[in-house]
Amino acid sequence: MSVDLSSATEGDLRELAARGAASLEGASARELLQWTEETFGSGASEGTGYRNSFIVASNMQDGVLVHLAAQVHPGVDVLFLDTGYHFAETIGTRDAVEQVYGVNVINARAEASVAEQDAAEGKDLFAREPNRCCALRKVAPLKKTLAGYKAWVTGIRRVEAPTRANAPLISFDDAFGLVKINPIAAWSDEDMQSYIDEHSILVNPLVDEGYPSIGCAPCTSKPAPGSDPRSGRWAGQAKTECGLHAS
């Protein structure tokens, strides 16, 4: 199916996602990213006025997904949600990933600074209303940034949490209105470590300190040994996702 991305409708994107999902079930991460490049990248942009119509999202826990994507699209756009609450180690990893892998990091930020949010909402909104804090500092900036693209690539994996156990490889993202590709959804922790070792991938130093899932500093703690890797996120609260991923 050939689609002029500059005028693609939601229906066109839904059909692209459905066709991709049907033809690429069981495909490797490389094959999924190659399809993404051919469908939404520079290989699909001739005559459409569109370039870089997909973006890769990374929380900078490691550089695996960015490294994979840069192999098929050098200089690819990489989305980082700069919430204002990140660990210094995460910011350092972001800067290193951009330099080492030669990608274009786009820092998506909330309309208000942390200080402005404190003044408007009260100090430490994350502790009182974590869902609202995520909506303001993650979901809204993400939605605004994704509006400029036709597809986004994420690093969610099925083994990370029960809420992600059925994550598809390719789907239409109803929440943000574009195609969503999860090329490493089927990867195990062993697959990740093998790729990191084989390619000397950059890893956030906090991983070696016992943080298997890294988010904003105030809302991230070390999970108990053997527990859900994401159980250290918003520990003690009835919250397991920040609102970015329905699956």
From Swiss-Prot:
Binding site for [4Fe-4S] cluster: 133-134, 216, 219
One matching Pfam family: PAPS_reduct
Major site of localization recorded for this protein: cytoplasm
Subcellular location as annotated: Cytoplasm
Entry annotation: catalytic residues: 242
Gene3D superfamilies tied to this protein: HUPs
Gene Ontology cellular-component terms listed: cytoplasm
Function: Catalyzes the formation of sulfite from adenosine 5'-phosphosulfate (APS) using thioredoxin as an electron donor.
Record protein name field: Adenosine 5'-phosphosulfate reductase
Name of the coding gene: cysH
